Amino acid sequence: MLDIFILMFFAIIGLVILSYIIYLL
């Protein structure tokens, strides 16, 4: 259960970084 929470946490961080990079482009 904790592993799923960590994966979701990193997935959200990845989406934020990806959207930030797209915003800079």
UniProtKB/Swiss-Prot annotation:
Stretches assigned to coiled coil: none
This protein's record includes keyword Transmembrane helix: yes
GO cellular component term, pick one: membrane
Protein localization: Membrane
Keywords for this protein: Membrane, Transmembrane, Transmembrane helix
Superkingdom of the source species: Eukaryota
Membrane topology: Single-pass membrane protein
Transmembrane segments: 4-24
Function: May play a key role in the skin fibroblasts (FBs)-keratinocyte-like cells (KLCs).
Name this polypeptide is given: LASP1 neighbor protein
Organism listed in the record: Homo sapiens (Human)
